[in-house]
């Protein structure tokens, strides 16, 4: 990570608004529609190069790829990069969290605008492994190609934290959820390593951290002390993922 003694270097959380053409491709992919792969790859590469230039133009020092290559959303993209899991038919929802209950009118208007594809229930059925080497390599190559000639201080790729990767899952293989979470951390560490080894910063997004409290209080009626174990295990799993990684090349983001 670059340091500055003259001023504070600027950055952002990582995700940026996708251009319309790229959004149409990703919406089609998310809904299982076959697209022209070569045309999509060109659109993705052009979009990443353009968003890097736009960040530079507005004065952002530490830029990202906008998370443009994460098709299934900022967290669900990783499901295509993991072995040992499968998706099954959607089960009944657990219920709305406290925030959704308090602002029901807002969410009633918000959700229909998001065009979210239907998600199945994520089930762990075997040993968790990482199989996304080609995908993360593509992320890196497209990002680094877009960075050529860019006058920026540094660059980072956002990735999902273990606890946020599959926040609503069923575990049918490991002895308990704690073992599941730590095995997931070990698998996802390979994605971290690939990014850091490529000379880029890696950002860990754990946006489901506040959601854990929101749902636990409103739906499960748990106390603060009872909820605390989940975030604590999530933090431990992140540290395990970072084992052997240079700390200056990584940072944690809990989006509130």
Provide a role label for each language-model segment.
Residues 1-256:
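Domain-level signal for soluble alpha/beta catalytic cores
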């Amino acid at each position: 990570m670059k340091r500055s003694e003259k001023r504070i270097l600027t950055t952002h959380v990582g995700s940026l608004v996708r251009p319309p053409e790229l959004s149409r491709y990703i919406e089609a992919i998310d809904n299982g529609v076959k697209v022209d792969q070569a045309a999509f790859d060109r659109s993705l590469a052009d979009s990443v190069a353009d968003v890097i230039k736009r960040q530079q133009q507005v004065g952002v020092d530490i830029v990202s790829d906008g998370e443009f290559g994460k098709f299934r959303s900022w967290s669900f993209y990783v499901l295509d990069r993991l072995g040992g899991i499968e998706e099954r038919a959607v089960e009944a929802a657990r219920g709305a969290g406290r925030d959704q209950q308090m602002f029901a009118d807002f969410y009633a208007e918000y959700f229909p605008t998001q065009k979210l594809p239907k998600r199945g229930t994520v089930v762990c059925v075997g040993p968790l492994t990482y199989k996304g080497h080609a995908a993360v390599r593509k992320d890196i190559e497209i990002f680094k190609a877009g960075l050529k000639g860019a006058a920026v201080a540094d660059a980072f790729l956002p990735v999902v934290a273990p606890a946020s990767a599959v926040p609503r899952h069923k575990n049918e293989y490991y002895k308990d959820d704690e073992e599941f979470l730590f095995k997931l951390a070990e698998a996802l560490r390979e994605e971290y390593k690939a990014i850091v080894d490529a000379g880029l910063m890696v950002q860990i997004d754990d946006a489901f951290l506040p959601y854990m409290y929101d749902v636990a209080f409103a739906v499960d009626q748990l106390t603060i002390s009872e909820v605390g174990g989940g975030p604590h295990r999530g933090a431990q799993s992140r540290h395990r993922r970072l084992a052997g990684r240079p700390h200056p090349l990584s940072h944690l983001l809990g989006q509130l």
